[in-house]
Amino acid sequence: MKDPLLFTPGPLITSATVKAAMQRDIGSRDADFIELLASIRSELLRIAGVSRDQGYEAVLMQGSGTFGLESVISSVIPPEGRFVVLANGAYGERMAAIAERLGISTRLARWPENESPDPARVQHLIEEEPAATHVAIVHCETTTGILNPIDEIAHIVKAAGREFIVDAMSSFGGVPIDLNKLEIDYVISSPNKCLESVPGFSFVLARRAVLETTKDCARSVSLDLFAQWEGLERNGQFRFTPPTHALLAFARALEELREEGGVSARAARYRANHEALRTGMNELGFAEYLPGERQSNIITAFRYPDDPNFRFEDFYHYLRARGFVIYPGKLSRAHCFRIGTIGRINEQDVRDLVAAIGRYARLKPSYVSATI
C-alpha cells in the first residue's frame, strides 16, 4: 500500500534515499560510525553558518526534540539562575513546564497565540527581571505557524547580558538563522522537521564559552548536555546507546540538503508550497488564523468553516482515505486545523491536497455555502 502524503510539521515525508540509508547495520563503537558522527556535527555547524573555530559546538542527544530542550534547560541554568520564557503557543508553554518541574525559578511571559512577543515589552520585562540569567523563545511556534522575531529579541537579550535559548525545532534548515550575528547561546532542533530526516535524536548548537561553564550543573544523568559534549569530544561517541539507523538516515538527509542548494533553496521550495496552499485554500473560502506578515512557510492554521455541520474527524478521514494526512488544531481559543508545507513535498502535491479538499466541500451542501 502506498504511504500517504504527510502535510505535517514532522515527522514528515522523507525521500526514498533517506529511508534506504537505514537499511544497513553499523556498530555504535565502530570507527566508521564515529567518523559519521564527526561529519554530522561539522555539517550542522556549517548549515548554521558557524564553525568550531568561531567557538561553536554541535552536541547530539538521544531522544526527541523535547529531550534536547529538556537537556538544555536542565543542564545550563544554575541552581541560583532564573529562567524567562517568552511564549505565544503550546511549545513555549512546554519549555516553562519543563523548567518548573525541575524546580527552576521561572517566569512565563505570555502573548496571544496570533501575536509575536513585542520587543518593547520584552525590553521592559528583562529590566523587571534583574535576577534572570536565561531567556528562551520558540522561533517557529507550530501551534499556529507564527514566526517569532528572534533577531530583535536576540539583540535585547544579549545587550542585557543574559543567555539566549532558541527552540528552532520547526525552523532550522528551512529558515535562515544567523547564529553568529545574533550571538544565540543555544539553538535546539531535530532531524525530522526541515532537515527532512527521521526522528530519534535531537541536537544542540552551543557557544563553547557558555557551554564550558555548565560542568556539574545538570539535573539529569542521561540528559547532561556538558557530559554529552565531553563524551563526544573525548572518544567521538554517545555516552549511551545512539540511534544508529536514524543517524545514517540523517547523514543522507544532510547530503540532500546540500544537493538542493542549502537552506535558501529549501526555504524557497517551502515558500512556493505555502503560496500554493494559501492561494488554493483562499479560493475555497478558508480563512487563515494568522495575518500574512506573521505567517511562516512551515505550517498554516486555518479556521473551521462557519458551519455547525463541519466535523474535523470526518474531514480528516476523508482526506486520509485519499492519501493525505493533515493535523488537528492546537489552539486554546480558536477552532482550527493545520496543514504543513515542509518535507519531501512540492507544489503539485499541495495542489492535489487542495483539490481533494475542494471535492470534500462539494459533497457537503451546507459546507459549500459556508466556505465558497
Which residues are covered by each model-predicted region?
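Active-site phosphate-binding strand-loop segment of PLP-dependent enzymes
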Residues: 117-173, 186
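Active-site C-terminal subdomain of aminotransferase-like
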Residues: 13, 192-279
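PLP-dependent aminotransferase-like
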Residues: 67, 75-131
